[in-house]
Curated annotation (Swiss-Prot):
The keyword Repeat does not apply. It is an enzyme of class 2 (transferase). This is Anhydro-N-acetylmuramic acid kinase. Pathway: Amino-sugar metabolism; 1,6-anhydro-N-acetylmuramate degradation; Cell wall biogenesis; peptidoglycan recycling. It comes from the Bacteria. Keywords: ATP-binding, Carbohydrate metabolism, Kinase, Nucleotide-binding, Transferase. It comes from Escherichia coli (strain 55989 / EAEC).
Amino acid sequence: MKSGRFIGVMSGTSLDGVDVVLATIDEHRVAQLASLSWPIPVSLKQAVLDICQGQQLTLSQFGQLDTQLGRLFADAVNALLKEQNLQARDIVAIGCHGQTVWHEPTGVEPHTLQIGDNNQIVARTGITVVGDFRRRDIALGGQGAPLVPAFHHALLAHPTERRMVLNIGGIANLSLLIPGQPVGGYDTGPGNMLMDAWIWRQAGKPYDKDAEWARAGKVILPLLQNMLSDPYFSQPAPKSTGREYFNYGWLERHLRHFPGVDPRDVQATLAELTAVTISEQVLLSGGCERLMVCGGGSRNPLLMARLAALLPGTEVTTTDAVGISGDDMEALAFAWLAWRTLAGLPGNLPSVTGASQETVLGAIFPANP
């Protein structure tokens, strides 16, 4: 069974940077050693946003974007190696999620697409890469997402305490770690995605730092109720979603009914939408004693306060409080999934994704010996 140093690479739906994590992994433990966040050039970020919202590209443009992202991921890995004074031979493998540009797990031909050419990463780092983690689960009738609940269960499950792990990235997803029950998990809906999109369009800021804009506004209840009527929120699990659904166009369609509103009030309403949709799903899933939050949203004081208010009797904390960096959780999970793939172990949970069976995930891109 392969064990040693692994690197995880994650570029999520928030597009706030490439997260790279170094960890030692074996069958008994996962120990994080180092991490860094690598910037995504504005032009590349915009190209990804455009394709996620349905802008058509030529095959040549699509191929160039795939190559550029692969090179970006390789640069991020090499920066971490240099920082830690490590060589390619010191690393067993890289687990690279890739950049999701489309996720449509239901319909006539279910599919998901993550890009960022893994061959570029191998060529530029000299390290074996495991990638393309989601499509095997979809081929077996699953959603292909979320995949991180398996990792949450391995690290954070408790024999008697009802726990849930909440990742608030661009999309928010919940892992249900309930003693005596199969692991559960699904996407609750938008996390930071709509809040980030709104403040970017209105104020040119990548995100609402410390929720300053949202705190200065007031929740527009009719707008909130209008958004909450979206059928995704009442859809039963298993379910997953992404930027191809909850994007700026989705927000604009709801705002048409509310002309002339204060932009800060919209920001406050979007924060409340995220908090309400998460808390409703926590309660519908039977509630928990402890909700451990990770991802960028864990640093949003308004979101954290609203979750605590909407979930009385639940201890709302961060994964940092139990020794796991909330910023690095997803990248760490894909390092762990790469270890499982190389060990020939399944990486999905049918109780979460709805797949017909457990399966080894991903494709292996071996480095030269």
